[in-house]
C-alpha cells in the first residue's frame, strides 16, 4: 500500500447488493440473525509483505550490517542481490536489483508474521531493515479472524462468482474451504486451525475448537483491508423452513453438492443465494464486520507503525 494511497482507502465502498428478485416462499416465522449469541472472534494481521527500493548507498550499508549481525542469516549474496532470514527465521528478506529493473518493480521485499514478533523485534526490524527502503509500501496483508467454535457445519458462500474449493477431513466434514485462487488479489481461506497445528506438531491449543477465516489481500487490494469481504457469508441455513417443496429440494441439493451451482444460470443462482441467506439464523460475517469496525483504529496504527514515524499502538 503506497503512502499516497493510504488516506484514500477508507473512502472505497462497493455496493454488493443482489438483484431484487421476487420473494420465494419460506416459513412465516421470519428469522432474526441477532437472536443467537456468538462470541467475538480474535482479529489480527497474520502476514505482511512490505516492498521498497534500496538505493546503491543504502544497499551497501545494509549489506555490511547484515553480514555481521548475529540475528541475520545471509545467503545467495552478490553485488546486486542477497537473501536473508532474521530474528530466528521469522523474517524473510530479499534484494534483487537486476530482477527489479527487468520487471520494473521495487527491488527489496520483507515478509513476516507480526503475531510472531515481540515489540522489541518489531522495532529492531523497522529501524535496522525497513527504514533503509524508499518508496516502501504493503503488497500483502492477511486479515485473520479466529473463532473458538466449530465452523465445519457452517455454509460459506460469496455473492461474487469465484472459484470455491473444499477439502474434507477424516470425519467427512469440511476442514478447509478456499474462495478464489492463490495468485488473485483476494484469496479467502476458512480452515480448522486447531487441526492444522496438530498436524504440524505446533503449539498445543487448549480450546475445544479453533477455526480461522483468513483473507489474503495482495497488490491494490491491500488498500481496502477494512472493506474486503462484503460479499462473503458464513451461514447456518435451515432448509426445512422453506415451504415450497421445489425450492426446499433445490436448496438442499445446493447445500450438499457444490457442483450443482455450476448448472444454474446467473439469475437463478442469485435467487437461491438470497433464499439461503434468508433462512439462516446467523451470518458470521456480520460479527466479523462489527469486530473489524471495533478494531479498525488499532489495526491502522499497526500499518502506520511500519510506514512512517511512529509510536507503538496501545
UniProtKB/Swiss-Prot annotation:
InterPro entries according to UniProt: REP-like_C, RepD-like_N
Pfam assignment, any one: RepD-like_N
Statement: the UniProt record of this protein carries the keyword Cytoplasm: no
Signal peptide: none
Region of interest (Disordered), residue spans: 1-25
Composition-biased stretches (Polar residues): 1-10
Keyword annotations from UniProtKB, A to Z: DNA replication, Plasmid
A Gene Ontology biological process term: DNA replication
Composition skew (Basic and acidic residues), residue ranges: 11-20
Family affiliation: Belongs to the plasmid replication initiation factor family.
Note: The nicking site of REP proteins is sequence, but not plasmid, specific.
Task of the protein: This protein is probably a specific topoisomerase involved in initiating replication. This protein is specifically required and may be rate-limiting for replication of the plasmid in vivo.
Record's protein name: Replication initiation protein
Organism listed in the record: Staphylococcus aureus
Lineage: Bacteria, Bacillati, Bacillota, Bacilli, Bacillales
Amino acid at each position: 500500500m503506497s503512502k499516497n494511497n493510504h488516506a484514500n482507502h477508507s473512502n472505497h465502498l462497493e455496493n454488493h447488493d443482489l438483484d431484487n428478485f421476487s420473494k420465494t416462499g419460506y416459513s412465516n416465522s421470519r428469522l432474526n440473525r441477532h437472536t443467537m449469541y456468538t462470541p467475538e472472534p480474535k482479529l489480527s494481521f497474520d502476514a505482511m509483505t512490505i516492498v521498497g527500493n534500496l538505493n546503491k548507498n543504502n544497499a551497501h550499508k545494509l549489506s555490511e550490517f547484515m553480514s555481521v549481525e548475529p540475528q541475520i542469516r545471509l545467503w545467495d549474496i552478490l553485488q546486486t542481490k542477497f537473501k536473508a532470514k532474521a530474528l530466528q527465521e521469522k523474517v524473510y528478506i530479499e534484494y534483487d536489483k537486476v530482477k527489479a529493473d527487468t520487471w520494473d518493480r521495487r527491488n527489496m521485499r520483507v515478509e513476516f508474521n507480526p503475531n510472531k514478533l515481540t515489540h522489541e523485534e518489531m522495532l529492531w526490524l523497522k529501524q535496522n531493515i525497513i527504514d533503509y527502503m524508499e518508496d516502501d509500501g504493503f503488497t500483502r496483508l492477511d486479515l485473520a479472524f479466529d473463532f473458538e467454535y466449530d465452523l465445519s457445519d457452517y455454509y460459506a458462500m460469496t455473492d461474487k462468482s469465484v472459484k470455491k474449493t473444499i477439502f474434507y477431513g477424516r470425519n467427512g466434514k469440511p476442514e478447509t474451504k478456499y474462495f478464489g485462487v492463490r495468485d488473485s488479489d483476494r484469496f479467502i481461506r476458512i480452515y480448522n486451525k486447531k487441526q492444522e497445528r496438530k498436524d504440524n506438531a505446533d503449539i498445543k491449543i487448549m480450546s475445544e475448537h479453533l477455526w480461522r477465516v483468513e483473507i489474503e489481500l495482495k497488490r491494490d487490494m491491500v488498500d481496502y483491508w477494512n472493506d474486503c469481504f462484503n460479499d462473503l457469508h458464513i451461514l447456518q441455513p435451515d432448509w426445512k423452513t422453506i415451504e415450497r417443496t421445489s425450492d426446499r429440494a433445490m436448496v438442499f441439493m445446493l447445500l450438499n453438492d457444490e457442483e450443482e451451482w455450476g448448472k444454474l444460470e446467473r439469475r437463478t443462482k442469485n435467487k437461491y443465494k438470497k433464499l439461503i441467506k434468508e433462512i439462516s439464523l446467523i451470518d458470521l460475517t456480520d460479527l466479523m464486520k462489527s469486530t473489524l469496525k471495533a478494531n479498525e483504529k488499532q489495526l491502522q496504527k499497526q500499518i502506520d507503525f511500519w510506514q512512517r514515524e511512529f509510536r507503538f499502538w496501545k
